[in-house]
Amino acid sequence: MPQKVRIALDAMGGDVGAAVVIPGAAIALSRHPDAEFLLFGDSAKIVPELDQHPRLKAVSRVIHTDVAVSMEDKPSQALRRGRKTSSMWLALEAVKKGEADVAVSAGNTGALVAMARFCLRMLEGIDRPALAAIWPTRRAKCVVLDLGATIGGDAHHLVALAAMGGALASVLFEKPRPTVGLLNIGVEEIKGHQEIREAGEMLRSMNLPQLDYIGFVEGDGIGKGEADVIVTEGFSGNIALKAAEGAVRQMMDLLRSAIKASWLAQIGYLLARGAFRVLREKIDPKNYNGSVVLGLNGIVVKSHGGSDAEGFARAVDVGYEMARFDLLTKINQTLNRDGGALAPAPVAQEAVS
């Protein structure tokens, strides 16, 4: 466990860049005073923001580059233009060199996954990365992966996701044997694609000591909190994520419209304002910002590109916790216990945007 948690930030990533990243880092520092920051990007944009946060400035070092990966770049374009020189690559390279414990970026998802895979390389036994995030549930929280790092995958890939997701959940939720379910169209063993059924059979027969496989989970089971970890391939996972985020926004819009519809409803809102505040905190996607890119020889966290300073700070919080509680070692231990079960998966397609 490091004395200080060294966090490399892609200060040019996201819709706004340094204007969100620097204030977000300042918020995160107020929660984690033992953090230090490496800020990669255009110093002309970083320094004025940094001057407004003296405490952050005292524990930060700016590494200048005027090359940034745009939100429109395809992964192949980002690698051609930004390899070795972009703020995103340099943040990842700091982790590779041991200068930072974790890299955080709000930049282009596909580019980040491709660069991270190319720069940090994959863990032994893992063929492709996965995006994992915390999801609010009726009971508490759960980890869902893959949320779109790659598309498709065979049974071995799903088993690898289960192993990595279990390690992540054990760190986040302090559970030595978190429950794991495979996302499927039904809970019966005959339901779903062949690779899902095979993965279920493998997980059940392996009976891994570090995770408790409970079987198939339907889409509504995520919100019910039926498992600590929900495993799916990236295409379905990304659709589930976007659908859930859209449902939350729709619900909040409908609620606001209903409150404004009559003076009686507005009085009711005033009386129940505290309960509404708790509800918003519980379901606001901003409060769950920060997806971990699993499967790499290093810790990388992806922040939502449109997040505000508080949202970006949440992503930094996730990276801090992953480094502080040594996620990489836990994943390696889990994979080593699995032995030969994690065979290479087919070549992955590009990340979902």
Curated annotation (Swiss-Prot):
Q: InterPro entries this protein is in?
A: FA_synthesis (IPR003664), Phospholipid_synth_PlsX-like (IPR012281)
GO MF assignments: phosphate:acyl-[acyl carrier protein] acyltransferase activity
Q: What class of enzyme is it?
A: transferase
Q: Where in the cell is it found?
A: Cytoplasm
The UniProt function text for this chain reads: Catalyzes the reversible formation of acyl-phosphate (acyl-PO(4)) from acyl-[acyl-carrier-protein] (acyl-ACP). This enzyme utilizes acyl-ACP as fatty acyl donor, but not acyl-CoA.
Q: Which Gene3D superfamilies does its entry note?
A: Isopropylmalate Dehydrogenase
Identify the EC number(s). 2.3.1.274
- Subunit note: Homodimer. Probably interacts with PlsY.
Which BP terms does GO give this entry?
Answer: fatty acid biosynthetic process; phospholipid biosynthetic process
UniProt pathway = Lipid metabolism; phospholipid metabolism
Name the UniProt key words of this record, in alphabetical order. Cytoplasm, Lipid biosynthesis, Lipid metabolism, Phospholipid biosynthesis, Phospholipid metabolism, Transferase
Q: Which family does it belong to?
A: Belongs to the PlsX family.
Q: Name one GO cellular component term.
A: cytoplasm
Supply the HAMAP family for this chain: PlsX
Annotated catalysed reactions: a fatty acyl-[ACP] + phosphate = an acyl phosphate + holo-[ACP]
Major place of localization? cytoplasm
Name of the protein described by the UniProt record? Phosphate acyltransferase
SUPFAM superfamilies in the cross-refs: Isocitrate/Isopropylmalate dehydrogenase-like
Pfam families reported for this sequence:
FA_synthesis
Q: Does the keyword Ligase apply?
A: no
